[in-house]
Amino acid sequence: MAAEICREEAAKSMPAAAAGATAIARRRRRVEGFRFAAGSLEPPQEDADAGVARCGKRQRVAGARAGAGAATAGPCRPSAGAEFGSRWWPRYGVTSVFGRRREMEDAVSIRPDFLRGSTSSGKHHFFGVFDGHGCSHVARMCQDRMHELVVDAYKKAVSGKEAAAAAPAWKDVMEKGFARMDDEATIWAKSRTGGEPACRCELQTPARCDHVGSTAVVAVVGPNRVVVANSGDSRAVLCRAGVPVPLSVDHKPDRPDELERIKAAGGRVIYWDGARVLGVLAMSRAIGDGYLKPYVTSEPEVTVTERADDDECLILASDGLWDVVTNEMACEVVRACFRSNGPPSPPGCSRPKAVLPPPAGASGGGGGDAVVKGVDKAESDKACADAALLLAKLAIARRSADNVSVVVVDLRRPVP
């Protein structure tokens, strides 16, 4: 089913002249964008490093191109049973591709059990997609620091309370975490006098690091609820009983409430290749972008959703996917992949693994690398990895002009 969708969209998008040499060259370049660094993360030990799938994102200025994408997946849930137990462990898959961009400016962060030692109310898992613009610096900073700042805010929220009974206001926790992330990005931008090697900041004269920013959509998945915080136009969608439930709303400058907020702050929305803040930025909220403050704010919108028996999956993705794929279609692709791989395994059983090529460029660099940390094996949960990859391919087939990063989290209960 999912493969048929991709083939149909590819057929629609390719003109009759695609048989020519130019079209063949384009397809070859597109295929090059699907190199992977992959792995599976075991449940963390006391000092185990959390998993990260890493990349970079946006703009059309030529720059160095290194690795191209990342795919990683979580292992089988070690224990679940009839209830969402405190040791519940999600499966997940990640795909990031260049698409039609010269550079990768997306970044993805996967941090299993990231509140370890801070709560006794069950394991909580952090998933984040960061879509950079101007360069990948801020997206990479969010990738490395956002989960740590959320942990700090969480600890302060439960300070002086019994950890098991503490029910922190997640809205406040996320807002403080995002605010500190924005402060760090602003301080970094002011301290820079030029770009890093092999990044586009150095191509600007003078180098303007305060022109760099990133969207941020973050999900904290726990045994009983899913918390989503969003700033920008990346998106989180929950699939529940086959019906897509948006857990975030894109921050576009022409969204009525955002337009009023920008005007109240003294800014303007100019329609130049779409609605843009001051005719520049195509989103109304982001981390960084110091030169557009206070019109562009980092304050996230936060939703807290109680988990249900018929939850199937959570999809986080950059606008490279959502610009061309509807919520309904994305959910159907994931459900088709889940059906083809069978029901979730019972506790203690291994899922089928999809073995992928070794990393294509695993060293850090100036914004175009794909790095997976804390991974020992080149393998991925098949259902989640298939779903994430198919969604990325579908976006490319539908002529997405951006980097595409997709995270698929399996929320289904295991079959006893």
UniProtKB/Swiss-Prot annotation:
Needed cofactors, names only, are: Mg(2+); Mn(2+)
Name the catalysed reactions: O-phospho-L-seryl-[protein] + H2O = L-seryl-[protein] + phosphate; O-phospho-L-threonyl-[protein] + H2O = L-threonyl-[protein] + phosphate
Residue numbers binding Mn(2+) 1: D131, G132
Q: How is the cofactor bound?
A: Binds 2 magnesium or manganese ions per subunit.
Q: Which domain of life is it from?
A: Eukaryota
Domain (PPM-type phosphatase) spans: 91-411
**EC number(s) for this protein?**
3.1.3.16
Gene Ontology, cellular component aspect: nucleus
Looking up Pfam families in the UniProt record yields: PP2C (PF00481)
Instruction: Output the Gene Ontology terms for molecular function.
Output: metal ion binding; protein serine/threonine phosphatase activity
Ranges for region Disordered? 343-368
- Gene3D superfamilies per the record? PPM-type phosphatase domain (3.60.40.10)
Keyword annotations for this protein, in alphabetical order, are:
Hydrolase, Magnesium, Manganese, Metal-binding, Protein phosphatase
PANTHER family per UniProt: PROTEIN PHOSPHATASE
Q: What is this protein called?
A: Probable protein phosphatase 2C 49
